Structures are given as structure tokens and as C-alpha cells.
Amino acid sequence: MNEYTIHFGGLAGHSSKPHLGVSAVEYASRYVNKLLEIREELKKRGPKDCIFDPPHSTLSIGGIKGGIAHNVIADKCSVEWETRPVTKADAEFVTNEIDKFANEALLPEMQKVFPQSFIKKEVIGEVVGFDRLDQSEACEFVSSITGDNSREVVSFGTEAGLFQEVGISTVVCGPGSIEQAHKIDEFIELDEIKKCLKFLEGVKDKSVN
């Protein structure tokens, strides 16, 4: 999962003379439209027999912030977005396409009117993907406690990939459901908490023995 905030800087002015200003909001809007085009391309690039749901890399616009009034050309705007690539190639595709558009299409237009115009990319986080392995000490350890030998994949991110990248056998196991995550009144069922406590007791017993 890769998260970014893109900062646009233009030139403020009165809306009656738009040719004398550089609207950061307008250029940010064009940037977002390009992201949406890329998102459609990602759907076509989904690998065959993909085990994820949906079966392709995703891209989402989380927020657009800019402008102070109807009659003022906005000199500042920011776009918050993320992508969840299912392949490394998709991650590179998204980065190359949107950066090229920003630097070669948008920025020259902005700086033609106001040389100090800018587009700055702030990396909020780039989380390494977590691969499902056929053989995993961590999975076998968890299965020995839970009795569940299933192996599932999900389309949301954790820090598991960071541990796996440095050679630590890793598994994601815990209470709750993504269906209740990141929403108003987010919750975990009490039965899930009870299962978690039982699991932790099992971890303790296995560690002692």
C-alpha cells in the first residue's frame, strides 16, 4: 500500500481575470482525472488467476483540499491518494504514469504563467507487500494453536511485509473484521475478543513448553 499527498502551488488572483493567475485547484483536478484514468488501466492489468478481491491493483482518492472563496483563484491545493498494487510492476506503472503527467504536462503549463508554481509529492508511506508462502513457520505455529490450516489473502495492508522482507517468518492473525474497519462506530465482536484471549493463552503455553 502506497500513500501520497500531492501539493500544488499556483498564483492567487481575482476570478474575473483567470488568465493572470494559476489555479492550483484546477490543476489538482486534472491530476485527479489522470489518476482515475490510471485506475481504469489497473483493472485491465489484473494478473490471471489473481487471488485478491478485487482481482487487480486499486487506486483511491482520499481527499482534495484547496481554495478560500468562489471569486478567488486558488493558489494552494492538495490531493490525498493511495494505491494498493498486487504486483511490483503495477506499483511502478502507477508511479511512472502519474509523475510523468505531473512533471511533463501540468507543471510546464503552470510555470509558463507563474515560474514559481510547483507540484510537490509527499510520500506518506510505501508499505512492502506481504507474499503468501507455501511454507511458513509462523503459519504452522498459529495453526498448531488454532487448529485452522486455511491460508487467506486480503486486499488491505499491514506491516507484515516489512518483517517478511528482512527474513522473519510472519503471519497476520487477530480479532475483528475489515467490514467494520475505518467506519463510524468501528467495533470488534466480544466473541472475537474471547477467541483472541484463548489464542494468546495458547501462544504463552507453547512458548513456555
Locate the predicted segments by residue.
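Metal-dependent amide/peptide-bond hydrolase catalytic core
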Residues: 2-209
